[in-house]
Every structure is written in structure tokens, then in C-alpha cells.
């Protein structure tokens, strides 16, 4: 997967726009949000996407995101925080409550590094965002070699990141997949980050300028003879 659209269930998106996203050339969708997420909205969005053959991932930020019938669950593990609530605390509580019913084969953990100090998610998780390139590379190696996480996700959350940071962190990984999200608002930015990331995630621009969002996916569309 080179490209995923991230949809916020707390935001409205017309069905016609959703159809355009499905046929844009993207490789799939993440449904996720930081706040004001209601299970009814999650279910409605999931059902609207249900007829596509593209993978749909539910990124679980809180219990209100849990939809038992979902095919894929993403579990964020925030690496650059000293608040254990976001590295394993909430995770342990949920497993204690629901462990016997969790479909583990459909669950994938993501090692998150959040780098936009002004983002809601940075404030919520108390993320330490003033990191050097060396810090971020070390987190990448931690994710792969100590925690054996399948995904290392660098999240600039609304702000376009530093391609050099992405290049260095990606180069430090051998087996863990590198995902990049944050501030992609043009096909040029999409192409730039895709040079280094295994997968790029495009979110906010969907709700700001749909046509530009679509352009970020069309560059990955398979050409037919």
C-alpha cells in the first residue's frame, strides 16, 4: 500500500465525495479521529465504504471507535510520550475488559511519533515533539528492534513534515513498515514523501479541497495498456 486516505467520522463528507475517493487510485482507508468520535458516526462511515474492495482500517483512539465487524484494527502506541497511558495503559485496560473477545489476527499495532506540537493529538498524549533527527531515528529502531512493531508512523498531524527526517527514519528500518502522515496538500508533496515512506496517509485536505486530495492518490493509480 502506497496511499491511504484517513477519514474522520466526526466530519461530514457527502456520498458523492466518498465515491470519488474510492475511485481515486488510493489503496485504502483509515477511519480515525482524536475527539468527538461517536460509534454511530463510525458505523455509518464504515457502512458507506463497505461496498468497496479496498481495505478499511479502524484506528482505535478510544472505546467509541470499536466496531466488532471491522476487518482491520490499528492500535496506536505513542512512543514519544512519558505518559504510560498512551504507550500501554489504555491498551492494558481494554485488553483486561475485552481480551477474550479481541480478534487478534485482525489487530495491528502502530508505533507513533507525533511531531506537531500544536496538534490536538500532541496535547492529548503529552507528546514530546522537540526531537532531533537522531531522536526520531532512535525511535524507529526502538519500534523495529525492541518492540517488533509492524508499523512505524511519523505523524505531523496537519503540518507538512521534513522530508529529510522521513528519509533518515525510513532508512533505519528493515522490516517494519514506515508510514507518514501530516500536511500533504498536493500531488507534489505526496510524491516527495512517497519516495521514502512505504505508505503515505492523506487526511485534512479531503475536507479542505477534495480535488487536491484526489490528486494525491492519482499518481499511484495503476496504468492500463
UniProtKB/Swiss-Prot annotation:
Disulfide bonds: none annotated. GO terms for molecular function: heptaprenylglyceryl phosphate synthase activity; magnesium ion binding. Its EC number is 2.5.1.n9. It comes from the Bacteria. Sn-glycerol 1-phosphate binds at residues 6, 153-158, 183, 203-204. Its cofactor is Mg(2+). The keyword Glycoprotein does not apply. Keywords: Lipid biosynthesis, Lipid metabolism, Magnesium, Metal-binding, Phospholipid biosynthesis, Phospholipid metabolism, Transferase. Pathway: Membrane lipid metabolism; glycerophospholipid metabolism. It catalyses: sn-glycerol 1-phosphate + all-trans-heptaprenyl diphosphate = 3-heptaprenyl-sn-glycero-1-phosphate + diphosphate. CDD domains: PcrB_like. GO terms for biological process: glycerophospholipid biosynthetic process. It is an enzyme of class 2 (transferase). Mg(2+) binds at residues 8, 34. InterPro entries: GGGP/HepGP_synthase_I, GGGP/HepGP_synthase_sf, GGGP_HepGP_synthase. Prenyltransferase that catalyzes in vivo the transfer of the heptaprenyl moiety of heptaprenyl pyrophosphate (HepPP; 35 carbon atoms) to the C3 hydroxyl of sn-glycerol-1-phosphate (G1P), producing heptaprenylglyceryl phosphate (HepGP). This reaction is an ether-bond-formation step in the biosynthesis of archaea-type G1P-based membrane lipids found in Bacillales. Belongs to the GGGP/HepGP synthase family. Group I subfamily. This is Heptaprenylglyceryl phosphate synthase. It comes from Listeria monocytogenes serotype 4b (strain F2365). The lineage of its organism: Bacteria, Bacillati, Bacillota, Bacilli, Bacillales.
Amino acid at each position: 500500500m502506497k496511499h491511504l486516505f484517513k477519514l474522520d467520522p466526526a466530519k461530514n463528507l457527502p456520498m458523492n465525495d466518498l465515491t470519488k475517493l474510492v475511485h481515486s487510485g488510493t489503496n485504502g482507508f483509515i477511519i480515525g479521529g482524536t475527539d468527538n468520535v461517536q460509534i454511530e458516526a463510525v458505523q455509518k462511515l464504515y457502512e458507506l465504504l463497505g461496498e468497496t474492495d479496498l481495505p478499511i482500517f479502524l484506528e482505535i483512539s478510544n472505546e467509541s471507535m470499536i466496531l466488532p465487524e471491522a476487518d482491520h484494527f490499528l492500535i496506536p502506541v505513542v512512543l514519544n510520550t512519558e505518559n504510560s497511558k498512551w504507550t500501554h495503559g489504555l491498551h492494558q485496560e481494554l485488553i483486561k475488559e475485552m481480551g477474550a473477545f479481541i480478534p487478534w489476527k485482525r489487530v495491528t499495532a502502530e508505533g507513533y511519533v507525533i511531531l506537531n506540537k500544536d496538534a490536538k493529538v500532541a496535547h492529548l498524549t503529552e507528546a514530546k515533539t522537540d526531537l532531533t533527527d537522531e531522536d526520531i531515528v532512535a525511535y524507529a529502531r526502538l519500534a523495529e528492534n525492541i518492540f517488533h512493531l509492524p508499523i512505524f508512523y511519523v505523524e505531523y498531524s496537519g503540518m507538512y513534515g521534513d522530508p529529510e527526517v522521513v528519509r533518515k527514519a525510513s532508512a533505519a528500518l528493515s522490516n517494519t513498515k514506515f508510514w507518514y502522515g501530516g500536511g500533504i496538500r498536493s500531488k507534489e508533496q505526496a510524491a516527495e514523501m512517497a519516495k521514502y515512506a512505504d505508505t503515505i496517509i492523506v487526511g485534512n485536505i479531503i475536507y479542505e479541497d477534495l480535488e487536491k486530495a484526489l490528486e494525491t492518490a492519482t499518481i499511484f493509480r495503476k496504468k492500463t495498456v
